[in-house]
């Protein structure tokens, strides 16, 4: 995921999940390791009408 999404927020906060994965009440943060890439979060929900990143999506 591009850092361009980092300053974008969901227009509808009800679409946002907690940062990281929520499995049975446990929130786990997913990092991209060993690839030399940026830290990657699946459900960081950094999207909205002002987002410059075309791949940002809110998870419902």
From Swiss-Prot:
One of its GO terms (biological process) is cellular detoxification. The lineage of its organism: Eukaryota, Viridiplantae, Streptophyta, Embryophyta, Tracheophyta. Belongs to the metallothionein superfamily. Type 15 family. GO terms for molecular function: metal ion binding. This is Metallothionein-like protein EMB30. It comes from Picea glauca (White spruce). Metallothioneins have a high content of cysteine residues that bind various heavy metals. It comes from the Eukaryota. Keywords: Metal-binding, Metal-thiolate cluster.
């Amino acid at each position: 995921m591009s850092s361009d999404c980092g300053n974008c927020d969901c227009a509808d906060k009800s679409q946002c999940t907690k940062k990281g994965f929520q499995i049975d009440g446990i929130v786990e943060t997913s990092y991209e390791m060993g690839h030399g890439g940026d830290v990657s979060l699946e459900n960081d929900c950094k999207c909205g009408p002002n987002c410059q990143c075309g791949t940002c999506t809110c998870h419902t």
